[in-house]
Structures are given as C-alpha cells and as structure tokens.
C-alpha cells in the first residue's frame, strides 16, 4: 500500500518518501477530490485523487480500485504511481497518485470542437476508437469489465492517444445471475456505479436467470463512438429532458445521416448498439474490423485497384 502520507507545511505532501507540492484543485466528485501536484524530486506534474472513506467498505473499495490499476501495464490504461491510506482521527482518506494529462479528457476535446461548430473527423475517430478498444481488450482478457466507460473517463495523452481511467466500477466480466434477489442487487449496483446515459440495456432490468458479460462495455463504447461522431451521447438529451433512459435503450438506435461518416463506421456503431447483448460483438471482433478501417499513416499511400 505504500508508506503513510503526511500533510506538511506550505501545501506539500509526502507520498512514499517523496515530497509533492500542491498546485491547484482539478475537480471533485461525490466522495473524491482530484488535485494537481508537482513532484519536487522530478519536477513532473501528477494528479492526486483523494477518496473520502466513511466506512470500512469505502476503504476496501478504494484499495480495490488501486489493485485494478496495478493489474495493467498497458498504454491505453491509466497507471497508478502510488497508493496509500491516510488517517485523520476517526476518518480515512485513500490517496491515489496518478499521471497528469494536460490535454484533459475525450469529452473536453468533444466540447472544445463543439464550441467551434465542428466535430472529430472520421480519421481522428478511428485511431481513438482503436486505442479505447485495445484498453478494453486488456481489461477483458484479465476477466474484468470496466462498467463505466464514457468520454469523461477517457484521458488524452500528449500524442492524442486515449487512456482509460476511473477503474472503481470494474468487476468480474461474466456474472451468472441466479434468482431475483441477485438480479435486483446487480441492478441496484449498476444504478450507483454505471453512468445512466452510457449504461447497457441489460443492466436496467436484470433478469432473474441470465448471464451479464463484458459486452456491457461494448454498448458503452458504442455510446462513446456516437458522442465522437455527433458531439453528444445518444441518450444524453433523453436524460437531460427527464425522460426514461431505461425505456429509450430498449429501442433500436436511430443513427443520424451525415456525409462526415462512412457506411462502414455507421455499421460498426450499429453493431455495438445492439439491444440484445447476445447479438452484440465481443471486443476482438470489433478490433479486427477497426484495424481494417484505420486511415493510412502520414506519408503512406494506398493504391486503388
């Protein structure tokens, strides 16, 4: 778990015997805060995520999130630099030290372009989609599913490469549901941990005897692709208007026509947004299709036959 942390004078903290200077607050959620800190030993910037732990279960979940990070050494999954639990009287805070991405998230980029009246081009979308899919492939290969994939949980590296973050909702990929009590428990868990407008249909009304697998991530990936194509998720407006997302996701998605997108990309999106999870493709199938669709590298020329 790393060494204990101490908050020192002049806004510095010590993590694993290294001192970090507080720079500014980056954001906050319901029970967590993210600060920008500078490593005084190397001059690099980091994101320090502080999770408030009110109960023992909160500590266990924070530690599990750290363990999920440590499972992966992958260019499309966020690395954990250090983890520790800080005690402050009867209260605890779990601290995760993470790399800082100055480009922000995929959603920041979508919003930036939308403010200019434009969208990501297909040649920009395809490499992003490939990187996100490779990150998911690595997660699924370890027997897990992300369960909360959305544009705000995808960071952009210096070269624009996508990096999956927020692994706190990850759980086993394949869940065998046996009985109404287990179904309701999973449904309640999803309502708390899986963002509503990116949540797969099978998680809104979990059947008493069924299998929920990693293809919930494929649905969410389809929603992310839609957001890259059209500047907002397919169910964002449904949620914002107060209409039922649970009802909306049970119907086949209507994909707007646009000259910006090829029929191949539209077909790929349509396959991801298949309501029946058993008919939805697995990530390796999508990857093989995506690799064939990738634009040529700069300086490369394709020959038309």
UniProtKB/Swiss-Prot annotation:
- Primary localization class, coarse: cytoplasm
Q: What is its EC number?
A: 2.7.11.1, 2.7.10.2
Kindly list the positions annotated as binding ATP: 26-34, 49
Positions of modified residues (Phosphoserine): 197
Locate the region Activation loop: 166-202
Residues annotated as domain Protein kinase: 20-293
Where does lipidation (S-palmitoyl cysteine) occur on this chain? 6, 8
Disulfide bridge map = none
Q: Tell me where it resides.
A: Cytoplasm, Perinuclear region; Membrane
Q: What is a GO molecular function of this protein?
A: protein serine kinase activity
Q: Which residues carry this modification: Phosphotyrosine?
A: 198
Q: Which reaction does it catalyse?
A: L-seryl-[protein] + ATP = O-phospho-L-seryl-[protein] + ADP + H(+); L-threonyl-[protein] + ATP = O-phospho-L-threonyl-[protein] + ADP + H(+); L-tyrosyl-[protein] + ATP = O-phospho-L-tyrosyl-[protein] + ADP + H(+)
Question: What are the lipidation residues for N-myristoyl glycine?
Answer: 2
Q: In which tissues is it expressed?
A: Ubiquitously expressed at low levels. Relatively higher levels in testis, kidney and liver.
GO CC terms on record?
cytosol; Golgi apparatus; Golgi-associated vesicle; nuclear body; perinuclear region of cytoplasm; plasma membrane
Q: Which UniProt keywords apply?
A: ATP-binding, Cytoplasm, Kinase, Lipoprotein, Membrane, Myristate, Nucleotide-binding, Palmitate, Phosphoprotein, Serine/threonine-protein kinase, Transferase
Q: How is it modified after translation?
A: Mainly autophosphorylated on serine/threonine residues. Also autophosphorylated on Tyr-198.
- Active site: which residues? 148
The similarity annotation says: Belongs to the protein kinase superfamily. Ser/Thr protein kinase family.
Q: Which PANTHER family match?
A: SERINE/THREONINE-PROTEIN KINASE 16, SERINE_THREONINE-PROTEIN KINASE 16
Task of the protein: Membrane-associated protein kinase that phosphorylates on serine and threonine residues. In vitro substrates include DRG1, ENO1 and EIF4EBP1. Also autophosphorylates. May be involved in secretory vesicle trafficking or intracellular signaling. May have a role in regulating stromal-epithelial interactions that occur during ductal morphogenesis in the mammary gland. May be involved in TGF-beta signaling. Able to autophosphorylate on Tyr residue; it is however unclear whether it has tyrosine-protein kinase toward other proteins.
Q: How does it assemble?
A: Monomer. Interacts with DRG1 (via its N-terminal); the interaction phosphorylates DRG1.
The name on file for this protein is Serine/threonine-protein kinase 16
Give the originating organism: Mus musculus (Mouse)
């Amino acid at each position: 778990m790393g060494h204990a942390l101490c908050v020192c004078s002049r806004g510095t903290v010590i993590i694993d015997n290294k001192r970090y200077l507080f720079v500014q607050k980056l954001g906050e959620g319901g029970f967590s805060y993210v600060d920008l800190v500078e490593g005084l030993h190397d001059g690099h910037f980091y994101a320090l995520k502080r999770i408030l732990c009110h109960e023992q279960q909160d500590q266990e979940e924070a530690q599990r999130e750290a363990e999920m990070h440590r499972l992966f050494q992958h260019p499309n999954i966020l690395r954990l630099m250090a983890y520790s639990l800080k005690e402050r009287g009867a209260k605890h805070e779990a601290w995760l030290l993470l790399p800082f991405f100055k480009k922000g998230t995929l959603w920041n980029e979508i919003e930036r372009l939308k403010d200019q009246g434009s969208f990501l081009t297909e040649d920009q979308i395809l490499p992003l989609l490939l990187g996100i899919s490779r990150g998911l492939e690595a997660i699924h290969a370890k027997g897990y599913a992300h369960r909360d994939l959305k544009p705000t949980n995808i960071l952009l590296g210096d070269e624009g490469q996508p990096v999956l973050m927020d692994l706190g909702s990850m759980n086993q990929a394949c869940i065998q549901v046996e009985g109404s009590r287990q179904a309701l428990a999973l449904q309640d868990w999803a309502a708390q941990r899986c963002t509503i407008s990116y949540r797969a249909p099978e998680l809104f009304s979990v059947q008493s005897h069924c299998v929920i697998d990693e293809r919930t991530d494929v649905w969410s990936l389809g929603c992310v692709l839609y957001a890259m194509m059209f500047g907002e998720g397919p169910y964002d407006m449904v949620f914002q208007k107060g209409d039922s997302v649970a009802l909306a996701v049970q119907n086949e998605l209507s994909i707007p026509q646009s000259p910006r997108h090829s029929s191949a990309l539209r077909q790929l999106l349509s396959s991801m947004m298949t309501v029946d999870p058993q008919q939805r493709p697995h990530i390796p199938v999508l990857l093989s299709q995506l690799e064939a669709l990738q634009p040529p590298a700069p300086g490369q020329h394709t020959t038309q036959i």
